[in-house]
Each structure stands twice: as structure tokens, then as C-alpha cells.
A protein has these predicted regions:
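N-terminal nucleotide/polyanion-binding subdomain common to many enzyme families
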Residues: 1-86
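A short, gly/pro- and small-residue-rich
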Residues: 53-58, 165-175
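Short active-site oxyanion
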Residues: 58-61, 102-104, 152-155
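Short glycine-rich, flexible loops that bind phosphorylated cofactors or substrates
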Residues: 71, 162-164
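Proline-aspartate-enriched helix->loop->beta-strand connector
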Residues: 147, 151-161, 168
Length: 175
């Protein structure tokens, strides 16, 4: 898999289908894998937040999300496909459902996550959501312990910050 650099961070050059295939393989193993759909705001945050920067550097798959990332790469002579995080997440939900893999959702306002779950359950056959929590929490360790108990193979995170998952968690897709 080829990676290109932008502002000191490695970004994968897979197209949408290739990213889905790669992430699906990651989801099937028992190792922790973090997938980030990177946007311009994340580069800015990484300048002042070393933990955030390290998560970006250590992610197994970094997908260019946001026209700013695509343009930045194009300016440096690298033409890559922009992969919208929401489209990628939706496809990974479909893959998980087809393979009967448990998923977790973390983030958003309480009413938004509830509506999302209702919509997904209505639209996606065989969906197995084993855990959900809104993005308003102070006890990170409690959330991590709850996730470990549920053993999801895919965790979709929609927060203004990245979460660092230890070696007991599955694929975590963050955008």
C-alpha cells in the first residue's frame, strides 16, 4: 500500500474500493487497528496536541477526507481520491452487517446518536449494534471498559477529537 506525505503525516492513496477492502481485512483480525479519515482541521489540531499527532502518525489507515487535503496533496504533485468519511463509514457499516460483525457507535449529541441508530436499524439488514454512547462523557476509562465488554469489531467514532484505543479494541474508524 502506497502512502504519501502531507505536512509531515502519511496519507494512504487507496481508492474507495481499495480502502474498504483493506479496512475489511483489518476488521477481521484480532489486532487493534485505527482508521482515520483525515481532514484539514486535524492537521491544525495536531500542531498543538502531541497525543492527537501521535494517533495520526500511528493509524493503520489514513484516508484523505476533505477537499482541503485533496488540494494540499495535489499542490505537492500527488493526485489521490478524496474519500468522504461519512460514505466510508456507511460502507463499513454495510460490510459489518453482511458479515454479522458487531459494531459500536461513539459520539454526537444524544438525540443524534439515537436517531442514527434508528435510521441504521431501519435501513441496514442484520445490523448488530452492540454499544452506543453519545459524545458527552468525562470518564474515558469507563467508555473503554464498556467497549471491551461488548467486543465490537468496528467502532465508529464521531467526536471533535480522536480516541486512542489500546490493544484490546478492534478497528476504530474516526472522522
Amino acid at each position: 500500500m502506497k502512502r504519501v506525505k502531507l505536512l509531515g503525516y502519511e496519507i494512504d492513496t487507496l481508492d474507495f474500493e481499495g480502502a474498504v477492502v483493506y479496512a475489511t481485512d483489518l476488521m477481521r483480525n484480532d489486532k487493534v487497528n485505527q482508521v482515520v479519515t483525515i481532514n484539514p482541521e486535524m492537521f491544525d489540531t495536531a500542531k498543538t496536541d502531541i497525543d492527537f499527532a501521535n494517533i495520526l502518525k500511528e493509524a493503520e489507515l489514513v484516508i484523505p477526507d476533505g477537499i482541503g487535503v485533496k488540494l494540499g496533496l495535489k499542490i505537492t504533485g500527488k493526485d489521490v481520491e478524496r474519500i468522504a468519511g461519512v460514505d466510508f463509514a456507511r460502507e463499513m457499516i454495510n460490510v459489518a452487517a453482511k458479515n454479522n460483525l458487531p459494531i459500536a457507535l461513539v459520539g454526537a449529541k444524544p438525540e443524534i446518536i439515537e436517531k442514527t441508530i434508528n435510521n441504521l436499524n431501519a435501513e441496514v439488514e442484520n445490523l448488530n449494534i452492540v454499544y452506543s454512547h453519545d459524545g458527552y462523557f468525562n470518564d474515558f476509562d469507563e467508555i473503554m471498559n464498556q467497549l471491551k465488554e461488548c467486543s465490537p469489531k468496528l467502532i465508529l467514532v464521531a467526536l471533535g477529537r480522536l480516541l486512542s484505543f489500546d490493544n484490546h479494541q478492534p478497528l476504530a474508524l474516526q472522522s
